């Protein structure tokens, strides 16, 4: 605690120094910590740039003149809690920048003074001086602000040497104080005086003189061994020339009558704010409480904090009434294990009441209490259970601020609540309140704290809290962010540590006024429902408290621990309307593409061909190789256009067929089966022929059925070789005349894989020889016999005609 106090005071000094002379940017504080290292002398290897040196809690017993020569920039030196017995301030003559020097809690018996003009803080308290260690040089330290002293004797002459200094704080820390000359303290010129008394010290004289000395007076370690009552019963409790307006008594252990007299004494002084902290009292009450004089006072505030009772022989009701009858504005009785409180049966002037951390119950509000000026009521840390009962009490006051946290409060739906329209701030945290609490809130509330309760949802029947600006509903059981339809002015919302998986869209849309949101540490489910919430931090003016480390995914498991800002949810997968539009556009584009292909590439024709090929492929798979060979009946199938039939009839057929029937030709007209479709007949003819001859001309490429025949022949699945197609170019075909679907034909023509009909009749012999050689197949004798017999039967059935030249074109 001592070190903390030193650091606090040092920070104050540094801030003051910076206000007088701002440091340059390159000048930085460098702290060297050598505390609690059992050092017996100051280290010789200190860094020259050191500005703060802590040598506290060591074994130093003497300081040498050369100890601090190397640290010329030293500003703060802490030497408390060592064993130093003598001090020569000339040791610091080279430390011109020294501002803070702490030598408290040593064994100092003497000090040799040297003018340290820049010193602002000097603490010599809790040492072994016989008298106050003050001389003329101390009076020349014009910048001194905080001074700590100690000594076994206090005399007026000690303080005369520094009476002209205006000090901020004087701290007197005594190990023993057997002698005090009355009237010594008022000589000091200080704003605050803090006295730490040793045991068995008559504090009364110091209290009287202290009130005459400073505006703020603090006294620590007051016990009842000083015979205060017997001493003061012989003296007048009145006091003249009082200066103190703030009085703090800390660590007080007195009989009740002693405390009673202190209250009465202070009541008639200049003290406006009186605080007693860590007080223990007991014993019998000999003084009459009704004798307390409440007149002639400037008292405004009384605080009793951390009150403990020993064996007590007085009714506590009398104590409560003694305090509540005081005509003051502010009363605090906290941490006192107080089971109840009594008020007079007439109106009081209390504006602020603090009964925190007691054991008050609902019985407090079952009596009539007249508080027409009450604005702040603090009842946290008690045993209150019924919220509606509190509201009925508050309705008779102009209450503005109410703290009911850390109680046992509940509210039932059938209980009526009536609050004054003045309530603006209410703390209901750490209770047992459920959803029904929203039906028992003042309409005027502006700041509401409901954290650590049992709230699961904000009911739709909630009172419209149009003035609510801040709502803290953290550490509850909510599964969704509350909408702002009932809180139209809400600007700050804290909803961390609930069970929110996916905040609803209603919050994003209805809470446009929210500027600060704390929704961290919730088990977020990172799906599309969370997309709008994630975008709040980026695309809105909402400040997300704790973003982004406190906002992580809990579900799905593969994203657990992932920060929300690192989760990427695609707009297409989360926006149903956009997804539908995208699908429609894609389908439309595909439809247009298919339509274009159908028009430009004759796609329907290819689809029909694919279907026919598929049927043929399935049929071929079910047919054995022997059956396939047995089905072959012709050497060649001839495909041609009707416009080229004369050439086929007059030239091709006569030159290919022989009278011995060694070459069998299949023509479409001759073997057409009326029971099958045209495409099935074409497939059948191609399957029953070893070769397919195509008579090419401009007429051929314009014929639809010729294209079918070429397509099926090209994809003849039972031919293992690729030479089963024979092309005869009857007339030249310009490439631009060939439709796109004839891409295979184009490729063959480019390779010149065809027989060209010669215009010179003398070359025809060679043409027919090549053609016969191309279609001539070595057929087994048995096969030839079978084929000849079948062919003869077919010829007889067709009236003895060997070849029919009838052809149906472009059916």
Swiss-Prot record:
TM region(s), chain numbering: 577-597
SMART domains named among the record's database cross-references: LRR_BAC (SM00364), LRR_TYP (SM00369), LRRCT (SM00082), TIR (SM00255)
GO CC term (a single one): receptor complex
A biological process from GO: cellular response to bacterial lipopeptide
Domain LRRCT: 522-576
InterPro entries in the cross-refs: Cys-rich_flank_reg_C (IPR000483), Leu-rich_rpt (IPR001611), Leu-rich_rpt_typical-subtyp (IPR003591), LRR_dom_sf (IPR032675), TIR_dom (IPR000157), Toll-like_receptor (IPR017241), Toll_tir_struct_dom_sf (IPR035897)
Keywords recorded for this protein, A-Z: Glycoprotein, Immunity, Inflammatory response, Innate immunity, Leucine-rich repeat, Membrane, NAD, Receptor, Repeat, Signal, Transmembrane, Transmembrane helix
Parts of the chain on the Extracellular side: 20-576
Compartment list: Membrane
Cited Pfam families: LRR_8, TIR
Domain spans labelled TIR: 632-775
Cytoplasmic-side segments: 598-811
Domain of life: Eukaryota
Annotated LRR repeat ranges: 24-46, 49-70, 73-94, 97-118, 119-139, 143-166, 296-321, 325-348, 349-368, 373-394, 398-419, 422-442, 444-465, 467-488, 489-509
Topology in the lipid bilayer: Single-pass type I membrane protein
Glycosylation site list: 33, 36, 140, 189, 236, 278, 330, 416, 427
Tissue-level expression: Highly expressed in spleen, lymph node, thymus, tonsil and at lower levels in lung. Highly expressed in promyelocytic HL-60 cells and in B-cell lines.
UniProt GO molecular function: identical protein binding; lipopeptide binding; NAD+ nucleosidase activity, cyclic ADP-ribose generating; signaling receptor activity; Toll-like receptor 2 binding; transmembrane signaling receptor activity
Primary residence: membrane
PANTHER family reported in the protein's UniProt record: TOLL-LIKE RECEPTOR (PTHR24365), TOLL-LIKE RECEPTOR 10 (PTHR24365:SF23)
Functional summary from the UniProt entry: Participates in the innate immune response to microbial agents. Acts via MYD88 and TRAF6, leading to NF-kappa-B activation, cytokine secretion and the inflammatory response.
Family designation: Belongs to the Toll-like receptor family.
Subunit-level organization: Binds MYD88 via their respective TIR domains. Homodimer (Potential).
Identification of the protein by name: Toll-like receptor 10
């Amino acid at each position: 605690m001592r070190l903390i106090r030193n650091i606090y005071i040092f920070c104050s000094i540094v801030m003051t120094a910076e206000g007088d002379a701002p440091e340059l940017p390159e000048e930085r504080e460098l702290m060297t910590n050598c505390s609690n290292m059992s050092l017996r002398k100051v280290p010789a290897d200190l860094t020259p740039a050191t500005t703060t040196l802590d040598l506290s809690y060591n074994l130093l017993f003497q300081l040498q003149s050369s100890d601090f020569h190397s640290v010329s920039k030293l500003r703060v030196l802490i030497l408390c809690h060592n064993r130093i017995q003598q001090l020569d301030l000339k040791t610091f003559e080279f430390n011109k920048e020294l501002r803070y020097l702490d030598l408290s809690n040593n064994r100092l018996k003497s000090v040799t003074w040297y003018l340290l003009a820049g010193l602002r803080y000097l603490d010599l308290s809790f040492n072994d001086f016989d008298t106050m260690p003050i001389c003329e040089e101390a009076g020349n330290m014009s910048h001194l602000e905080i001074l700590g002293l100690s000594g076994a004797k206090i005399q007026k002459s000690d303080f005369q040497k520094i009476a002209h200094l205006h000090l901020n704080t004087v701290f007197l820390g005594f190990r023993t104080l057997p002698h005090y000359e009355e009237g010594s303290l008022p000589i000091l010129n200080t704003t605050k005086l803090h006295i730490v008394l040793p045991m068995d010290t008559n504090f009364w004289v110091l209290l009287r003189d202290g009130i005459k000395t400073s505006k703020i007076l603090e006294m620590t370690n007051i016990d009842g061994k000083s015979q205060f009552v017997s001493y003061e019963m012989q003296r007048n409790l009145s006091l003249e020339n009082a200066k103190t307006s703030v009085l703090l008594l800390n660590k007080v252990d007195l009989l009740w009558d002693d405390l009673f007299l202190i209250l009465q004494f202070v009541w008639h002084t200049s003290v406006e704010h009186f605080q007693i902290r860590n007080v223990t009292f007991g014993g019998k009450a000999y003084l009459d409480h009704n004798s307390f004089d409440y007149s002639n006072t400037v008292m405004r505030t009384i605080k009793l904090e951390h009150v403990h009772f020993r064996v007590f022989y007085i009714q506590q009701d009398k104590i409560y009434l003694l305090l509540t009858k005081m005509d003051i504005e502010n009363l605090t009785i906290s941490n006192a294990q107080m089971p109840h409180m009594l008020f007079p049966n007439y109106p009081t002037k209390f504006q602020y009441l603090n009964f925190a951390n007691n054991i008050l119950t609902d019985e407090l509000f079952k009596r009539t209490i007249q508080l027409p000026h009450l604005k702040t009521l603090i009842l946290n840390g008690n045993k209150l259970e019924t919220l509606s009962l509190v509201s009925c009490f508050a309705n008779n006051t102009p209450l503005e601020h109410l703290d009911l946290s850390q109680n046992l409060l509940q509210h039932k739906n059938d209980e009526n609540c009536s609050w004054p329209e003045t309530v603006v701030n209410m703390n209901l945290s750490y209770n047992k309140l459920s959803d029904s609490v929203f039906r028992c809130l003042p309409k005027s509330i502006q700041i509401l704290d409901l954290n650590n309760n049992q709230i699961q949802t904000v009911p739709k029947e909630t009172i419209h809290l149009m003035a609510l600006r801040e709502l803290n509903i953290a550490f509850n059981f909510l599964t969704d962010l509350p909408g702002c339809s009932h809180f139209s002015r809400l600007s700050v919302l804290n909803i961390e540590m609930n069970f929110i998986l996916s905040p609803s869209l209603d919050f994003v849309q209805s809470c446009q006024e929210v500027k600060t949101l704390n929704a961290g540490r919730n088990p977020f489910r990172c799906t599309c429902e969370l997309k709008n919430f994630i975008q709040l931090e980026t695309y809105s003016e909402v400040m997300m408290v704790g973003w982004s480390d406190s906002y992580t995914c809990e579900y799905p498991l593969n994203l657990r621990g992932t920060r929300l800002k690192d989760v990427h949810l695609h707009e297409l997968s989360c926006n149903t309307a956009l997804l539908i539009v995208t699908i429609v556009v894609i389908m439309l584009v595909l439809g247009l593409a298919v339509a274009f292909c159908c028009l430009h590439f004759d796609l329907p024709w290819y689809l029909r061909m694919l279907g026919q090929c598929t049927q043929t492929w399935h049929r071929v798979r079910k047919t054995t190789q022997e059956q396939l060979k047995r089905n072959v009946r012709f050497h060649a199938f001839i495909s041609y256009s009707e416009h080229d039939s004369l050439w086929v009839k007059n030239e091709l057929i006569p030159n290919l067929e022989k009278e011995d029937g060694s070459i069998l030709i299949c023509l479409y007209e001759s073997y057409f089966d009326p029971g099958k479709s045209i495409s099935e007949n074409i497939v059948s003819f191609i399957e029953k022929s070893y070769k397919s001859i195509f008579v090419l001309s401009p007429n051929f490429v314009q014929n639809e059925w010729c294209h079918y025949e070429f397509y099926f022949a090209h994809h003849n699945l039972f031919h293992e070789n690729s030479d089963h197609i024979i092309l005869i170019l009857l007339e030249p075909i310009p490439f631009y005349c060939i439709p796109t679907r004839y891409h295979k034909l184009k490729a063959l023509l480019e390779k010149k894989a065809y027989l060209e009909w010669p215009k010179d009749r003398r070359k025809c012999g060679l043409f027919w020889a090549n053609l016969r050689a191309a279609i001539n197949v070595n057929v087994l004798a048995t096969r030839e016999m079978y084929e000849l017999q079948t062919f003869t039967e077919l010829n007889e059935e067709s009236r003895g005609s060997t070849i029919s030249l009838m052809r149906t074109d472009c059916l």
